[in-house]
Swiss-Prot record:
Gene that encodes the chain: pncB
Similarity remark: Belongs to the NAPRTase family.
Residues annotated as signal peptide: none
Superkingdom per UniProt: Bacteria
Name listed for the protein in its UniProt record: Nicotinate phosphoribosyltransferase
GO cellular component terms, semicolon-separated: cytosol
Reported modifications of this chain: Transiently phosphorylated on a His residue during the reaction cycle. Phosphorylation strongly increases the affinity for substrates and increases the rate of nicotinate D-ribonucleotide production. Dephosphorylation regenerates the low-affinity form of the enzyme, leading to product release.
Residues the record lists as Phosphohistidine modifications: H214
Catalysis performed (reactions): nicotinate + 5-phospho-alpha-D-ribose 1-diphosphate + ATP + H2O = nicotinate beta-D-ribonucleotide + ADP + phosphate + diphosphate
Pathway assigned to this chain's UniProt record: Cofactor biosynthesis; NAD(+) biosynthesis; nicotinate D-ribonucleotide from nicotinate: step 1/1
Source organism per UniProt: Xanthomonas euvesicatoria pv. vesicatoria (strain 85-10) (Xanthomonas campestris pv. vesicatoria)
Length: 392
């Protein structure tokens, strides 16, 4: 069994789930899986993946796990009570080998947002681990050697250059993830600030980290009062739920231009910072700093969180470029948890519909957008004043 606990997921799944429970408990959603890595035959492992999903759906939170969640300042008592009764239901998930694309799998999740939101991260971890344990021999000594080099590189930087682990969804294996976190904790000291993984945060006494993901803002394209106001509605909903806590806003759901138009003086003051997850990080940081300054907000009081495909070299370059001008945080994923030699898979599970309507992410990076309805993508770009899609 790959997943042993429902806590073996990213914190932001629980923080979003709490907001869904309180504000949109009846919302219905569709998610779809996509493998962006060409030539990967996952279909041969569909039965093995299915058995792991069955095991996942038998899990419930133990009393000590619920108590741990209760201990987090932003988890409310009614949500903890709800989680004590919660389990993932297999009826909301469909998994088959693709009938039209040999080697591919068709994985869809459809059901109440409240009851399906926790599927994504463990499913991706399952697919990764099934793939790698069947197609490669792990060289853990090579992984440890690479990890020591990364620790040494970071230790050569000023103490303010700090990282967090964001690598659950694309890790090589649960075992490797569990081994490397104490190595980072002990090797980096205060330069390692925590992990997005709630299970390992509990196990190793680390700080669990995370706020919101793209799906939260995407859903408001269907839940909000009108499409043009969907980002504002999502951010205001978040502020109602957390009253200033967990104040990192995700900036690339409909591209940075549209985000900055919506992120007015109120949001600049209310939120603690913004997270970069696509596009050029240096250009993004410069534009965010300029935006804050234009609203008479001192960037040195705000946090810029970088989390898009980071490695230690990029962390160091970003730190050197920005550290005197703002506060910084770096979430490193695949480069930490899946760097043992074999090529990591580029796999995602994205929300594609909410309440029967298409929703989409207009990423600042080509190829990261995902939507089933091309007409809706064109409409979304038009509503937010973005250039038309390239035809062809």
């Amino acid at each position: 069994m790959i997943i042993h606990s429902l806590l073996d997921t990213d914190l932001y799944k629980f923080t979003m789930m709490q907001a869904v429970l309180h504000q949109h408990p009846a919302a219905q959603v569709d998610y779809r899986f996509k493998c962006r890595t060409p030539g990967v035959d996952l279909a041969q492992f569909v039965d093995e993946i299915s058995r792991e999903i069955d095991a996942l759906c038998r899990l419930r939170l133990r009393e000590d796990e619920v108590d741990y969640l209760r201990s987090l300042r932003f988890i409310k008592p009614d949500f903890a009570d709800f989680l004590a009764l919660f389990h993932l239901d297999r009826k909301y998930l469909s998994l088959t080998a693709s009938a039209t694309h040999p080697g591919e799998i068709e994985l869809t999740i459809r059901g109440p947002w409240l009851h399906t939101i926790l599927f994504e991260v463990p499913l991706l971890a399952i697919i990764n681990e099934v793939w790698f344990r069947n197609t490669s021999e792990p060289d853990f000594e090579e992984g440890r050697s690479r990890l020591r080099e990364k620790v040494a590189s970071l230790r050569s930087m000023p103490a303010g250059c700090k990282i967090a682990d964001y690598g659950t969804r694309r890790r090589y294996s649960r075992q490797w993830h569990g081994e490397l976190l104490p190595l980072l904790r002990d090797g980096l000291g205060e330069q390692f600030v925590g992990t997005s993984n709630v299970y390992f945060a509990k196990q190793y006494g680390l700080t669990p980290l995370g706020t919101m993901a793209h799906e939260y803002l995407q859903a408001f394209q269907a839940l909000g009062p009108r499409l043009r106001d969907s980002q504002v509605a999502a951010l205001e909903s978040w502020a109602r739920e957390y009253r200033g806590d967990l104040g990192i806003a995700l900036s690339d759901v409909v591209g940075l231009d549209a985000f900055l138009r919506d992120f007015d003086l109120y949001f600049c003051k209310l939120f603690d910072g913004m997270r970069h997850d696509s596009g050029d990080p240096f250009e993004w940081g410069e534009r965010v700093i300029a935006h804050l300054e234009a609203h008479r907000v001192d960037p040195r009081t705000k946090v810029l969180v970088f989390s898009d495909g980071l490695n230690i070299d990029k962390v160091m370059r970003l730190y050197q470029h920005f550290h005197t001008r703002c506060r910084l945080a770096f979430g490193v994923g695949t480069s930490l948890t899946n760097d043992l030699g074999p090529t990591p898979l580029q796999i995602v599970i994205k929300m594609v519909r909410c309440n029967g309507q298409p929703v989409a992410k207009l990423s600042d990076s080509p190829g990261k957008s995902m939507c089933e309805d091309i007409g809706y993508l064109r409409y979304l770009r038009d509503v937010f004043g973005l250039p038309p899609m390239a035809e062809g």
